[in-house]
Amino acid sequence: MNLNELKKKAAWAALDYIYPGTVIGVGTGSTVFYFIQALSTVKHLISGAVSSSNSSTVLLKKNGIRVLDLNTFDFLEIYVDSADEINNDMQMIKGGGAALTKEKIIAAMSKKFVCIIDESKKVNILGTFPLPIEIIPIAFSYISKEILKIGGQPKLRENIITDNGNVIIDVYNLFINDPISVEKKINSLPGVVSVGLFASRVADVVLIGTQKGVEIIKN
């Protein structure tokens, strides 16, 4: 099986965590694309979805799934999203799709975070995949210098403006042995909107598409 088939396996397995009448938080990315397709088969059972990006909103509506405003809820029962990398502690790098800020907000408001990945995303140490940081544009020079101080190589992601009107710095060669500390450090920098390091709010369940089937890891 190729990676897309493994992603699809994990995405469809997430339906086991969907219950009638609930509102589903929905992430962004290629694996989530398969989850939205799967979710459309039970759309008559759920109350709707909260979307983490404009691109996911388009896909949800295209599949006939009602999209709701997050601000009308105090919490969500479940959030389903993928990750660019995930370690053994279920901490993640996310934001390859530039939706990290909304993803963090929805994850924080959700009782259960189900992460759907293919087996290539599982790592021992985070950082092989570049770490995304959403920043306001005027802060690029300052934040880049601060990232260099902690050993990372910052690069502006070209031709990308986030749904919030900001830009993305991708940090290369930053191998993250202490994810919680790094998350706090970067979040404290003036001009940072959000960092794509999910170290404090980890996944509750990870569904991993493998050649042998779907592996389930619970926190």
Curated annotation (Swiss-Prot):
Gene3D superfamilies linked to this entry: 3.30.70.260, 3.40.50.1360
Enzyme class, broadest EC rank: isomerase
Keyword field contains Ion transport: no
Active site: 103 (proton acceptor)
Highest taxon in the source lineage: Bacteria
Binding site for substrate: 28-31, 81-84, 94-97, 121
Keywords on record: Isomerase
One GO term of the biological process aspect: D-ribose metabolic process
UniProt-listed Enzyme Commission number(s): 5.3.1.6
UniProt xrefs under InterPro entries: NagB/RpiA_transferase-like, Ribose5P_isomerase_typA_subgr, Ribose5P_isomerase_type_A
A cellular component term, taken from the record's GO annotations: cytosol
Reactions catalysed: aldehydo-D-ribose 5-phosphate = D-ribulose 5-phosphate
Keyword Isomerase: yes
Pfam families referenced in this protein's UniProt entry, alphabetically: Rib_5-P_isom_A
This protein's pathway: Carbohydrate degradation; pentose phosphate pathway; D-ribose 5-phosphate from D-ribulose 5-phosphate (non-oxidative stage): step 1/1
Molecular functions (GO terms): ribose-5-phosphate isomerase activity
Function: Catalyzes the reversible conversion of ribose-5-phosphate to ribulose 5-phosphate.
Protein family per UniProt: Belongs to the ribose 5-phosphate isomerase family.
Subunit and partners: Homodimer.
NCBIfam families, sorted: PRK00702.1, rpiA
Protein name stated in the entry: Ribose-5-phosphate isomerase A
Gene for this chain: rpiA
